[in-house]
């Protein structure tokens, strides 16, 4: 079974943990408890292929930025999350993306831009078009709006990253070994 190392990045309070826990455990975490680093494993099937996802839920706060290079070096796919209710969280993602590209030393990194908390439409300050435009600027990066609370596009975030990784490095099809018989 192929393993995938996915990393969830973004500013503090955007809902990285809520998205991850909703995906892995199917529950919504109401209380905000800042993360230092949490790792989750979940077995899923994407496009008829069994996959083991290792999801790293990272700290959004500035005091843990030294750990980021390591996440970025080891990660295969990245969800860059902002809150549609806070413009600053959207603005912070440009630097994060540039850091990923620098650490990976390539422009071709499986990545998805995620506008979280789309259930809070009344509090929206970042328009959907802003997200779409930024994704276009980022070499047509994938983009979704999500809500951990309302379970909107939660699975799709992680499945999309798996598909991007598979496109970059296709899954080896299992070849049946042919038994050979040699007569002496």
From Swiss-Prot:
Enzyme class: hydrolase
S-geranylgeranyl cysteine lipid attachment residues: 181
GO BP terms, alphabetized: Rap protein signal transduction
Stored Pfam families: Ras (PF00071)
Propeptide residues, chain positions: 182-184
Binding residues annotated for GTP, in chain numbering: 10-17, 57-61, 116-119
Its EC number(s): 3.6.5.2
Catalytic reaction annotation: GTP + H2O = GDP + phosphate + H(+)
PTM annotation (Cysteine methyl ester): residues: 181
InterPro entries xrefs: P-loop_NTPase, Rap1, Small_GTP-bd, Small_GTPase, Small_GTPase_Ras-type
Subcellular compartments: Cell membrane
Topology of the protein relative to the lipid bilayer: Lipid-anchor
A GO term for molecular function: GTP binding
Motif Effector region: positions: 32-40
Superkingdom of the source species: Eukaryota
Keyword vocabulary terms for this entry: Cell membrane, GTP-binding, Hydrolase, Lipoprotein, Membrane, Methylation, Nucleotide-binding, Prenylation
GO cellular component, one term: plasma membrane
Primary localisation category: membrane
Stored PANTHER family: RAS, DI-RAS, AND RHEB FAMILY MEMBERS OF SMALL GTPASE SUPERFAMILY
Family: Belongs to the small GTPase superfamily. Ras family.
Protein name per Swiss-Prot or TrEMBL: Ras-related protein O-Krev
Source organism per UniProt: Diplobatis ommata (Ocellated electric ray)
